[in-house]
Amino acid sequence: MQEWFQNLFAATLGLGDLGITVGLVVSVIVKIVIILIPLILTVAYLTYFERKVIGFMQLRVGPNVTGPWGLIQPFADVFKLLFKEVTRPKLSNKALFYIGPIMSLAPSFAAWAVIPFNEEWVLTNINIGLLYILMITSLSVYGVIIAGWASNSKYSFLGAMRASAQSISYEIAMSAALVCVVMVSGSMNFSDIVAAQAKGIAGGSVFSWNWLPLFPIFIVYLISAVAETNRAPFDVAEGESEIVAGHHVEYSGFAFALFFLAEYIFMILIAALTSLMFLGGWLSPFPQSWGIVGTPSAFWMFAKMAAVLYWYLWIRATFPRYRYDQIMRLGWKVLIPIGFAYIVILGVWMISPLNLWK
């Protein structure tokens, strides 16, 4: 795509060297649009799917009035939020009040720059893709803290403190789990990590994916991922029964929609990261001898992401909310020790004769 745009502007339109630069910029913008528009539409219908799934689990119907089978409900929700007035507390910090939602949303968008959907569908294929993801997603907590403090509300500030402490705590456990994947893959490049899952003793099958040999750390990662996204049962940052709605209690209209969008984009990002790191990415679960069914493709990547997102919804509908002290105890006294212990165990395993990743 980049070469096509550069040829278009440099040769066809006669812009010369300037055309090469313009073509590069235009190709990047087009790639960003190709990622962002499906991503926003996915968020819209993820909310619809969530309400339908939870309604089914609770023996309800869910959205079924706006459009056929309620399919236009996400757009109705968007228009409702867009046309609502954005109000703010009189004593709040105006600049920081509006910067908070933007700082929460921007990292969740920027992280998609390095997420591949197959060997070719990636905006930027860098060797430190995993490190980039961990770095960029950790910035979103600043938006939460700023929003909670700038609102000048005790409920907002308490929710922001809870969210930031929880996010920082579970980032440690999640990072420990991802370190284990890097150890067995020998790379932080997502394409290399996926390729490594097709090798080893059980290479070419679903049993060679990282979820099986790293199963204990896979469970640690899944729990940490739910806590990182502040989803039920770890949604104490916005515990309605305790602190009304957490750090975005004072937000309305489009400003609230930005927080909402950031949360769901982060959910989809975690689903993509889970697929790449533990579930073989775009690798097929079937042997390649099965023809097109066994061929690696972006379809399998999307299917695995959908399965992880369904797991998110199932967890929300099944488990009650934990108390804040229980969440912090689980993170610091259970998941983090298990994560660090497994790093040591995995190191010994890899230098032993029982190494599965040779």
From Swiss-Prot:
InterPro entries: NADH_UbQ_OxRdtase_su1/FPO, NADH_UbQ_OxRdtase_su1_CS. GO terms for biological process: aerobic respiration. Its EC number is 7.1.1.-. It comes from Neisseria meningitidis serogroup B (strain ATCC BAA-335 / MC58). The gene is nuoH. Its main location: membrane. It is found in: Cell inner membrane. Keywords: Cell inner membrane, Cell membrane, Membrane, NAD, Quinone, Translocase, Transmembrane, Transmembrane helix, Ubiquinone. It is a multi-pass membrane protein. NDH-1 is composed of 14 different subunits. Subunits NuoA, H, J, K, L, M, N constitute the membrane sector of the complex. One of its GO terms (cellular component) is respiratory chain complex I. NDH-1 shuttles electrons from NADH, via FMN and iron-sulfur (Fe-S) centers, to quinones in the respiratory chain. The immediate electron acceptor for the enzyme in this species is believed to be ubiquinone. Couples the redox reaction to proton translocation (for every two electrons transferred, four hydrogen ions are translocated across the cytoplasmic membrane), and thus conserves the redox energy in a proton gradient. This subunit may bind ubiquinone. This is NADH-quinone oxidoreductase subunit H. It catalyses: a quinone + NADH + 5 H(+)(in) = a quinol + NAD(+) + 4 H(+)(out). The chain crosses the membrane at residues 20-40, 95-115, 128-148, 168-188, 206-226, 253-273, 295-315, 334-354. It holds the Pfam family NADHdh. Belongs to the complex I subunit 1 family. GO terms for molecular function: oxidoreductase activity, acting on NAD(P)H, quinone or similar compound as acceptor; quinone binding.
